[in-house]
């Protein structure tokens, strides 16, 4: 045929736009498409693209553009080419005009098209210019435009060249070829990147992100990240290998934007009080707010991040448009395969279109995912920063309602859950759109039979929602049990010394395993429901297809089930199934996110510190006054009653004011009121000048000594040295391995209690403040150290002389040195004046002193006189004492966040020398997970269950393959009179295979989850047992945070993540085998292409897994630092505010978050790199399957072709998820490595021994004998105690004293076998303690430590952990310690729930409760290890009186700093350098005038 039948001549218009050129059966190259259609598409599509998107793009770069670019060579070439194109199209427009002028008739389009292109090219050239001015270095818009300009016109040009029309219109064709060449050149240039901006706003980072230097194709496919992935494959990645963070991703930028919007929205709330949020005083209100405060936060998030979210949503919508183009193209392709007379080029074209549609879907979907993941990263940073800034302004009442662990949980769980929900926001509306489009497709394919799909779908939807709701209930129950387990575990680890000292491990393990059992029960139920849900999702495609096919076969007139109807229906139903699956899941995730969002909003609305609570202004004070309180009434929160009433106080410049009073009088509250920490009900507070604060419980940071002291101030070495010497830290620091640069560990793990307190004091002194507020800083110090510190720092001649000082103290002998004394009682000022004035008044102060003078029992006269002298005599007895350096704790590693109280992680290792101190760091695994880890997990699952699971997966996948193959046979059945003969049989077998697949799928899913629960149970028990059986030295060396990670985060991964990743991997791996088998069986030729594709997949997988595993581990470690810093700041927020250090602390938090983002960003880019490239290769497999089907059309049925191509369409996601699942599983398997870290650590001696059971009443008398006893705390350290040989008689009361580092506490550790003897031994009632199990030994000895310890739970549980006493006995013990009235006043009385570790009680009250607990144990041996050091003299007298009555017949070992405490002991042991230097009664030792006498002199007792 002639070409004129298919081509329009240049002068004629196109009458129709039929796509297919049907004039010839086998057309030549230039007959492929109708020329008129190509002309219309080529003429209008590129201009429409640019004119629609161009103005929007101009507006965007106008708002978001940066500095202009240099006029580079690349820009000049682009502009020259642009002007050349303008000239050519001007010429093309001028030619028709010239011809019209000459009278030649011309078609309208010959003038319209060049004119449109002329204006469009002018606009494109203008965009090139504007991009340079706005700093755009690689344009995606123009890349797409030049690409469109090349594709369709190129086909048109090829057709014209093939038609041989060059000779007819040579000039026109030359212009066309030249234009095409210039457009191709522009396309090539648009793939290049221009030079950086001429003037950059920021200095160039050391390792900039290569995205800025990437071309548009590289950005689209994330090839710019390949360098980092290749580097991670070749070596271990370090911080220097990661890209620098862009400013738009920095914490400072993100948090400031969100905080500004949030505060603006919050201020618009009705009832807003200005400085403070809505009060939520109870922890329950924090966890489950009664009324939502989400509005301001939600609006703030939307205003800050809406542009990123909306751009991502646009990409998703475009991606879904191409998603739904694939079924239509598949329908056309199967129609082509079923028509034996159709032309081959139709199949080729459809294969190319399916490939392009799939590629465009991949491109836009990955761009959506990239934008959403970046949005998630930014939102996590912004909200975490907002929470951190809120922590810095929380009021004291708000802090009491939440613990550090709650805040960390808020950031690590709730924030994460919130940001993950962003991915599901579009699911609320877009999935419904999917469903509508799917039903439209089904109606077109099957007609009214598609209505049955609607019915089945609607019947399954409530089932899925019901399952999701039930599963959500059990998940919430699991979360509650997990939270309970986490709190109990945290308490156990932070109080492990107390637990081990009392032999309570079994009780706590039993309690913990009970909670764990309930948690696993909820987990199993949730997993069972999840299995049902997964099966319903997977089988819903089959159910809908079965019903639709059955109805269509029975009802429809044209009821033949051909390949197009069968496999296009299945393809559409697979999309519908995704919608059905993700819709309930999206709703569930959003519901969970709403709960988390409410918690976050409630926390952000908690009451803040009143900025007007304390005025730093001299206007309210006279010129000589520094502090003034006028008619002050203060409360801890809006709901609590006032704790201070009618306070009127004026403190002049340079005054030392001592504040005293009984326990609970309000002494610490007064300091908090001065700091503005309490809610000011009425009155005014004014302070002139800067303030420094020393808390009662020392708070130190996990940094070096010098950084703790300087506390974000400039280093002044002479002043630093002077401060350290005055605070009695000079000799200590000199003994440290790195001097002032020695890390102190988290919460000062590497320091003794006294060192931490003096470090806290040094921090305040270094400040050079005008006003000093000190909350009993001398309580934790030895007598001689206390004297030295008071004289050199606080006293009249100390470093702080001339400053205004308020000293809360229980050390009454310093009162004569104070300028003024304030006595508080019941929250009011009882009296105030000088020491002599108050003595003459004979008022409240005299009552306190008289109480301190009262002896606890009958003692020696000299001891009583000495006690009186100690209380009232001041420092009359001695000059400046000679001090030895107090030796730090023996830990090699620092722990992480924890309470500063608790002897637990703080052995008073006053006797241990430290050879090296380093901050503890958690172990980080490198490289691939070892096969032994997988084997250990599989052994925990069980070999039979593993084998059974694989068999079930194989069976259900075989059923799935047979189901698809059987459908292809059904589709190929011959049609006779519009009907197929065996439809009933085909349908029945199809349904049977589907049922078998459903059963196998449910069984396999359930087997995976049950196996995971079994493995999790065994691994947790193993971890718990390994940790509980570890000696105390293990806890001193291992940070608490590391252990908590094992019991919380790592255990959660083993519980949930590993079974889920294992299920996903097995599902997709077996599905991949099915796809490969289907494609290979239908078109064996495809194997030739599949093998290279699989090699490329393996290469991508290797690069990704090697890098991603490292990035995830680094990210986890960096995020732990963020959480640790957050917890540390929460615990010390009062100090931070007092020192006005919020700015530096915020900057440190931002730096830690930025470092975390430097790792998070490459990881999310690596995920997109993998997905984009694997989907691109998967799309190639679709193309291979389609082209092979076209090549094999002569002998390939339409049914098999549909089976092959429809399976190949699923392989894109399948192959990606195989790699992703394997990577996720390997990352999750790191948790198994970590929970097994402590399997091979040394363990304690057995808790129970058979020999112990034979002596149930041991010990009867309580005689203790040391025989040449010695111990060291670690093999590399010197002996802490050596050569101790002595006998303590039954019922004897022995005091143990000595300087710091003398070995006092080490004796008690040896007695309790917290440290095993290195030499010699200890006998109790003639029985070696090594013959007794540890629990038998420790349960027969009672110890009251210096720092009182309470546990989460009821007051009764704390008093009687083993439930061995009646309520009457407990009340009797409480009455003995004079706490019965206090406990009676509590809500619930004995069932009163203690907050945290008794944070809602004073130190004195907690110590008395610990004493009551000791009374209830009824043991023959009692150890008091500095038990009265932190309490006031009145409380100490109460304790001594109770001990005298209850333990009169028991052997008592009393370790004391205050020599007054041991003056009425029958015998005193004086320890020195690990040996017993002196032994005898107090009177005898004083008469000897030896070491005890010198200690008494330093304490003012001699």
UniProtKB/Swiss-Prot annotation:
Gene Ontology MF term list: ABC-type glutathione S-conjugate transporter activity; ABC-type xenobiotic transporter activity; ATP binding; ATP hydrolysis activity; ATPase-coupled transmembrane transporter activity; inorganic diphosphate transmembrane transporter activity
For this chain, the family text in UniProt reads:
Belongs to the ABC transporter superfamily. ABCC family. Conjugate transporter (TC 3.A.1.208) subfamily.
One Pfam entry for this protein is ABC_membrane
- Phylogenetic classification of the source organism: Eukaryota, Metazoa, Chordata, Craniata, Vertebrata
Protein name, UniProt field: ATP-binding cassette sub-family C member 6
What CDD domains has UniProt attached to this entry? ABC_6TM_MRP1_2_3_6_D1_like, ABC_6TM_MRP1_2_3_6_D2_like, ABCC_MRP_domain1, ABCC_MRP_domain2
- Output the PTM entry: Glycosylated.
List, for all copies, the residue spans of the domain called ABC transporter.
627-851, 1264-1498
Gene transcribed to yield this protein: Abcc6
